[in-house]
Amino acid sequence: IFVSSTEGAYRERDWQVRFAGQGYNWLGDPGNPAPPPWLEDLQAAGIPAQWSPDILSRLWRKLAINCAINPLTVLHQCRNGGLLGHLDQVQALCVELERLLRQCGQPHAAQDLEQDVQRVLLATATNYASMYQDVRAGRRTEVQYLLGYACQAARRHGLHLPHLEHLLQCLVDNLRVRGLPCD
């Protein structure tokens, strides 16, 4: 079972996570499009959840949105809404991420990506991205799980995505200067 969630939480310190806001959860099994009977138990318990027969598309879309937002907030040292002043960079990344999604067999996830990223920037304008918060707190980031994964997928498919590769290198350099792990 795969899950994509918009629930808000952050790590205060090791082994302590604080719930920061209710979101929504999409669950799915790429091998079985039918929802399991226990899904109703989650909903009855007050956990907002929905079965998504196309969960992989949702997860790829979330990866792309996070790749377009999180690293730039670190490099520009800003809240999500601060990226509205850097839409040229956001747009260039979205063009490349759309190419990647299509090449990875996820055309639905690629549709209107830039508009969705801008919607997220507006809806979360006062929030700090998780990667920004991790850097600020001196914690390990998810750079390799986001940008690293996307760049590896691009190489596997023979795609040259210069903006994405440059962003990864700039972020890794930024983390090294701060003495933070880059792997």
Residue spans for each PLM region:
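Helix-loop-beta segment of a Rossmann-like dinucleotide-binding subdomain
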Residues: D14-N25, V74-G82, N127-R136
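Rossmann-fold dinucleotide-binding core
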Residues: I1-R58
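Long, contiguous hydrophobic alpha-helical segments, chiefly transmembrane helices and signal peptides
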Residues: S5, N25, A64-V74, M131, ...
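Solvent-exposed, flexible loop/coil residues
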Residues: Y10, D14, G21, L59, ...
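Short, charge-rich amphipathic segments
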Residues: A20-P37, Q50, R79-D88, R102-P107, ...
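NAD(P)-dependent Rossmann-like dehydrogenase/reductase catalytic/cofactor-binding core
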Residues: Q91-D183
